[in-house]
């Protein structure tokens, strides 16, 4: 699991650093959301920020483990840490 240096829990919020792996420059966004936010909403927002299609994108950990977005953001944070990667579908499996 990732170290929590970029993550802070202020009140009931969790912070994620999401990196776009399909761009060689590896741009990232730091998002803070309430723990109860559905992670599907976090995925959709991050994909829109990177201008990639949310419906065909996946979130993985830095270790390459897929993340099931059908759970609250707080659960994702506890299980996988704060550093995640966004992969557009055309890159999944590459």
UniProtKB/Swiss-Prot annotation:
There is a cross-link at residue 93 (Glycyl lysine isopeptide (Gly-Lys) (interchain with K-? in acceptor proteins)). The keyword Ubl conjugation applies. GO terms for biological process: protein ufmylation; response to endoplasmic reticulum stress; reticulophagy. There is a cross-link at residue 79 (Glycyl lysine isopeptide (Lys-Gly) (interchain with G-Cter in UFM1)). InterPro entries: Ubiquitin-like_domsf, UFM1. The keyword Repeat does not apply. Expressed in the intestine and head neurons. Belongs to the UFM1 family. Ubiquitin-like modifier which can be covalently attached via an isopeptide bond to substrate proteins as a monomer or a lysine-linked polymer. The so-called ufmylation requires the ufm-1-activating E1 enzyme uba-5, the ufm-1-conjugating E2 enzyme ufc-1, and probably the ufm-1-ligase E3 enzyme ufl-1. Interacts with odr-8; leading to deufmylation. This is Ubiquitin-fold modifier 1. The lineage of its organism: Eukaryota, Metazoa, Ecdysozoa, Nematoda, Chromadorea. The gene is ufm-1.
